[in-house]
Curated annotation (Swiss-Prot):
Gene that this sequence comes from: Ppt2
Catalytic activity: hexadecanoyl-CoA + H2O = hexadecanoate + CoA + H(+); S-hexadecanoyl-N-acetylcysteamine + H2O = N-acetylcysteamine + hexadecanoate + H(+)
Protein name per Swiss-Prot or TrEMBL: Lysosomal thioesterase PPT2
Subcellular location: Lysosome
Species this protein is from: Rattus norvegicus (Rat)
Enzyme class: hydrolase
UniProt keyword terms in alphabetical order: Disulfide bond, Glycoprotein, Hydrolase, Lysosome, Signal
Function of the protein: Catalyzes the cleavage of thioester bonds from S-palmitoyl-CoA or S-palmitoyl-N-acetylcysteamine (unbranched structures) but does not have activity against palmitoylcysteine or palmitoylated proteins, branched structures or bulky head groups. Conversely, hydrolyzes both long and short chain fatty acyl-CoA substrate.
Disulfide topology: 109-117, 165-176, 276-296
Amino acid sequence: MPGLWRQRLPSAWALLLLPFLPLLLPAAPAPHRGSYKPVIVVHGLFDSSYSFRHLLDYINETHPGTVVTVLDLFDGRESLRPLWEQVQGFREAVVPIMEKAPEGVHLICYSQGGLVCRALLSVMDEHNVDSFISLSSPQMGQYGDTDYLKWLFPTSMRSNLYRICYSPWGQEFSICNYWHDPHHDDLYLNASSFLALINGERDHPNATAWRKNFLRVGRLVLIGGPDDGVITPWQSSFFGFYDANETVLEMEEQPVYLRDSFGLKTLLARGAIVRCPMAGVSHTTWHSNRTLYDACIEPWLS
């Protein structure tokens, strides 16, 4: 009997200790948060995927395991190709990524790339974009002398660039696709083959479908600032723009908003527009500024 008791004692003690096992064993590492949605990054004028190495590091650090794709299309001078041509190329690249992400994706689109992405959201019937983050993008157009323009059109100034941009030849350059001269609005409306269409400023047979598609987006995050130095006016990053007197009218004063021509008013009404202005950031440093990332980008990468 004593021998039998000694044989059973370990089993009895094991039963008594079972409730306390979680306290006795070392704690298991906390599991990672559920998988993050894939992130697609679209670069700007004269850019390439290499420019976004810091942004890639920030995302990997704060949201480990996130699949980030920086699309390597229309790099360098190829970014001057007509924007509709670029939209088609980027569309072919993003469709397979979206198809593999039934929970949705996020878009981070920088400068000219923000216009490419807005057009993508307009023409894609089945896109599944949750956050569209427009990073210092001339969403209402550009009207300013920049080094890019001086290099491309050395004999022109912003006051007479409309003569080139609002011609069939000029519309073959991406910059002219969103050149918005407030002193020649009639020419802009008639000649713009890109911005006037995605803004719904000129009638076209796809306007209703494009608006419906754009409104599929979960959230529109607008980022820009007064020290950008390239986007002119800088409020274009927030859908503000000049009137004929070069007074800036904010988004809520713009005809495209008041008419809700492509969905801005609807998005704002449902609380789906986030505006994140930040001073002290120059145009070429938006995607490498950690403070900006933490405040304006990271919160929307679910």
